[in-house]
From Swiss-Prot:
Matches recorded under Gene3D superfamilies: mk0293 like domain, Transcriptional regulatory protein pf0864 domain like
Signal peptide: none
Keyword Lyase: yes
Organism encoding this protein: Staphylococcus saprophyticus subsp. saprophyticus (strain ATCC 15305 / DSM 20229 / NCIMB 8711 / NCTC 7292 / S-41)
Originating gene: larC
Protein name per the record: Pyridinium-3,5-bisthiocarboxylic acid mononucleotide nickel insertion protein
Key words, A-Z: Lyase, Nickel
Length: 391
């Protein structure tokens, strides 16, 4: 059984909103506070209180400092975490989040990561938000994290470098390859801290799948809008082997080019199909053709039938339900000689039976190292076996 967290970021995500939602979910404030007090931080106090945001009761957070605090370099933060007595998983998760922000800032300013002088995350409240959220995850026993697409907001924002369009440069860099949601609001909805949390720890971006929801918490931001400025944190459980039913949609096509079919596959996957592929077949009178197959959830079958009829030359679609059984999958980021690599794990009976590095991470590592994909993949796979016990 996996204890998971789904973040509904319909109004964006910021560090204080996230930590507040986890406390509302049931994380022990004393556990979080005492661990934070063990770190060499400026004197501070955490004040959580319920607030009403357009009819939604949500937890809010105010952090008070006894005196003005200063920005810190990335290397200072990494050293502080490494030398701390924080739980190992809290250290790992916190480091991953800070690393995401450091890499974004380093690229934007043309610097080495260790020389990055954080503005957003070097501020003490952001350090507390990040490490505090990871402590809250640990207290709740969260094993995996998923998220909805995130909106960035519109307009302009004042940052350390002046007035800049939303999303801020660091936020935009972090959110590359992350699905975004449209929300036409003239304000910043997602901060670099919130974006980094999603980028570093979320293993899936999309709608919440069929799981058993066990608890829900709400965390609010400081801004007031005409909509509830809250993030919804949903705690769920998922079994390791999940039997379910899916819908298979098929049609046979003999008048579309491979390029057009390839484009269709990309589009239908982007629309949310579980899988899509085409197979060469031979039709009557020995005509070469293609069988197009789209797999969707049962509830979305009608939607994808219409999509196939609209975007292909087919005049009809066959549809039937099938049972499938899938192993529970979760993701873990490991540090290798090529940097942080996301690894997909397949679980059975509380044991890891398969582990595979994600293609995009291996590809990027190969491009940056100048080595062949095969060599880099084999090196990373060997390091995966050292970090992860596979039965």
């Amino acid at each position: 059984m996996t204890n998971g967290l789904y973040l509904d970021c319909h109004a964006g995500i910021a560090g204080d909103m996230l930590l507040s939602s986890l406390v509302d979910l049931g994380a022990d404030v004393d556990y979080v506070h005492q661990h934070l007090l063990s770190l060499p931080l400026d004197q501070f106090s955490l004040n959580f209180a319920k607030k009403n945001k357009q009819g939604i009761q949500a937890m809010g957070l105010t952090i008070d400092f006894e005196e003005a605090h200063h920005h810190r370099k990335a290397s200072d933060i990494f050293n502080m975490i490494n030398e701390s007595t924080l739980p190992n998983r809290v250290k790992e998760r916190s480091m991953l989040i800070f690393d995401v922000i450091a890499q974004a800032e380093a690229k934007i300013h043309g610097m080495k990561i260790e020389d990055v002088h954080f503005h957003e995350v070097g501020a003490m409240d952001s350090i507390i938000d990040i490490i505090g959220s990871c402590l809250a995850l640990e207290d709740l026993g969260i094993d995996e994290i998923k998220s909805s697409p995130v909106p960035t907001g519109n307009g302009k924002i004042k940052i350390a470098h002046g007035i800049y369009p939303i999303p801020a440069p660091a936020t935009a860099e972090i959110l590359k390859d992350i699905p975004l949601a449209t929300f036409d609001v003239q304000s910043e909805l997602t901060t670099p801290t919130g974006a980094a949390f999603i980028k570093a720890l979320a293993t899936h971006i999309g709608p919440l799948s069929a799981v058993s929801m066990s608890n829900i918490g709400y965390g609010c931001g400081t801004k007031d809008f005409e909509f509830p400025n809250v993030i919804r944190a949903i705690q769920y459980t998922a079994t390791e082997t999940t039997p379910n039913q899916v819908q298979v949609l098929e049609c046979q096509i003999d008048d579309m080019t491979p390029e057009t079919l390839g484009y269709f596959i990309e589009q239908v996957i982007n629309e949310g199909a579980l899988d899509a592929f085409y197979t060469p077949i031979t039709m009557k009178k020995s005509r070469p053709a293609t069988q197009l197959t789209v797999i969707s959830s049962v509830t979305q079958a009608k939607e994808f039938e219409d999509f196939i009829l609209k975007h292909t030359t087919s005049l009809g679609v066959r549809s039937y339900a099938v049972n499938r059984k899938i192993l529970h999958r979760q993701f873990q980021t490991i540090h290798t000689t090529y940097g942080a690599i996301l690894v997909k794990l397949a679980m059975k009976d509380n044991k890891i039976i398969k582990a595979k590095p994600e293609f995009e991470d291996v590809k990027n590592a190969a491009l940056h190292s100048g080595q062949s994909f095969t060599n880099v993949y084999n090196d990373i796979q060997n390091e995966v076996r050292k970090h992860i016990q596979i039965d």
